[in-house]
Amino acid sequence: VELGIPAQAAKGEDDMTSSLDDTSHAADADATPARASVVFLFDVDNTLLDNDRVIADLRRYLVRELGAERTDQYFELFERNRAELGYADYLGALQSYRVCYPRDPHVLAVSSFLVNYPFANRLFPGSLDALEHAGRFGPTVILSDGDVVFQPRKVERSGLFDAVEKRVLIYIHKEQELEDVERRFPAQHYVLIDDKIRILTAVKQCWGRRLTTVFPRQGHYASAPEVQRYPAADLAIERIGELLDYDLPALMQAAQP
């Protein structure tokens, strides 16, 4: 689904991951998955889906429903929760807002907006084509961070759940769960596509030449100052659709130690 989490929370995370993938033998703890030659691991937010635009839509909606001042308060609560939890939790921030304003009648409308948002409309051009292209070479897997309600909902409603044939893993800190990733989807080689250079670097430090890192320069992280503080990814592309320009040999050969 980042942080040390209590055993009960960890169990809940594992249950949630399995429920997303209950028809996949790779997600069944009792099965012994076959070792693939290559597995493709795709992030969601700002990799396959324009999450910056989702947040912009949310802010506009909140301003209309709650007003500018309370919208700012909502996002302050959101950032505070993210600092404490280690992941984005929009519904959790709404619950915190509700504690502050228990009689605000707009809370239910905002909740409905989040849960029913048309995420499929926010897929980047070429996202589904990139998944289909990679799927010709090996299994494609969603590897994401997030809460246990909103992030799975986003994956399902966007169509990504079906596009990867229900192979979905959502952790709190995915870069700390690589052993579980390998257990569920064993492979000789992995290709990780993620808009956060920090994540790419952390996974590369663990898997080394067994991993090809692909950095799509999409979303606000692409121009963040921290990008310059990390080693370059094995491959950088300007948009997710450019993944179609690379065949399997090119992706494998791009892997650096």
Regions found by a protein language model. Give the residues of each.
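Active-site neighborhood of HAD-like aspartate-dependent phosphohydrolases
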Residues: L20-D22, D28-E76
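Conserved SAM-binding loop
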Residues: L48, T140, L192
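Generic enzyme active-site microenvironment
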Residues: L41-D43, L143, L192-I193
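Short, acidic loop-to-helix structural element flanking the phosphoryl-transfer center
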Residues: V115-I142, I172-D180
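A metal-dependent, Asp-based hydrolase signature
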Residues: V54, E65-A68, F78-V115
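Asp-based, Mg2+/Mn2+-dependent phosphohydrolase catalytic module
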Residues: L3-G4, Q8, T17-R35, E156-L192, ...
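Substrate-recognition/cap helix-loop segment adjacent to the acidic, metal-dependent catalytic center
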Residues: E132-V141, D145-L169
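Conserved Rossmann-like nucleotide-cofactor binding loop
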Residues: T47, V148-V149, R198
